[in-house]
Amino acid sequence: MPGLRILCLHGQGSNTEIMKAQLGPITKLLKQNGVATFEWLEGTIPTEAGPGVSGVFEDEQSIREACEDLEDYLEENGPYDGILGFSQGSTLLAEFLCDFARRNPGNEPPCRCAIFMNGIPPYRMGDDEKPIIDYGLLEHFPSIPTLHVVGKKDFVYEYSTILQASTASAWATLIAHEKGHEISNDTRIVQKINSAFEQMSIRIALGC
């Protein structure tokens, strides 16, 4: 069974080279085991470095542009079996998948699985500078297998668990590590991620 072809979306204030380094132990093991191969998409929205939930998708126009850019890239370079997003890359991924399903009812989703690392569901910033989850949009999340890797000390931990619960119409697994808003390369966590990818690959092959 061929490995999954995965497209990776980096987070706020980051880039593809940083994300490659952050995911290095994970992608190395998955490649060695023939489970998945990875490609990287550079973001087009300038942002400040560091964690945070403001400053990226502050208006409807920037959200639409980011989703359109991702859809265009997939049409030109796909198909991909799955898409992986870290931090704001996860938010874009969730936004894109829900919006695509809402605009194209009955169509196949643009990928067959999704991986969210330290993710936040689609949201808009409230007047108090706190994210307001767009539950109406989340209702359109496609029925595809998802993997959620979250940090128990992450400032978005609560939002990450909301995202996982909102995608549970299909197979959705949660892997929690003891760190914060970062990609954990703890050997035990890396092995768990490898196992989850293997399970997703089997489910995709079986069409469930």
Swiss-Prot record:
GO terms of molecular function: hydrolase activity
Gene Ontology CC terms, in alphabetical order: cytoplasm; nucleus
Keyword Methyltransferase: no
EC number: 3.1.2.-
Pfam families recorded: FSH1
Enzyme class at the top of the EC tree: hydrolase
Gene3D superfamilies: alpha/beta hydrolase
SUPFAM superfamilies associated with the record: alpha/beta-Hydrolases (SSF53474)
Pathway noted in the entry: Secondary metabolite biosynthesis
Record note on biotechnological use: Phomoidrides A and B (also known as CP-225,917 and CP-263,114) are potent inhibitors of Ras farnesyltransferase and squalene synthase. CP-225,917 and CP-263,114 inhibit Ras farnesyl transferase from rat brain with IC(50) values of 6 uM and 20 uoM, respectively. CP-225,917 inhibits squalene synthase with an IC(50) value of 43 uM and CP-263,114 with an IC(50) of 160 uM.
Active-site residues, Swiss-Prot/TrEMBL: 87 (charge relay system)
PANTHER family recorded: ESTERASE ALNB, ESTERASE OVCA2
Protein name per UniProt: Hydrolase phiM
